[in-house]
């Protein structure tokens, strides 16, 4: 029962992110991640380019 509830919550959260990713959630996170990567040359962004 606990596993079923966890899976349901994960699916709901994933669908919510898919709805709001282009307008609210992903752009600020990506901008902050890119800014952090540019300020930290040891970050994975530099290691894998």
Swiss-Prot record:
Keywords: Membrane, Transmembrane, Transmembrane helix. The chain crosses the membrane at residues 17-39. The keyword Transmembrane applies. It is a single-pass membrane protein. It is found in: Membrane. Its main location: membrane. It comes from the Eukaryota. GO terms for cellular component: membrane. This is Uncharacterized membrane protein YHR175W-A. It comes from Saccharomyces cerevisiae (strain ATCC 204508 / S288c) (Baker's yeast). The lineage of its organism: Eukaryota, Fungi, Dikarya, Ascomycota, Saccharomycotina.
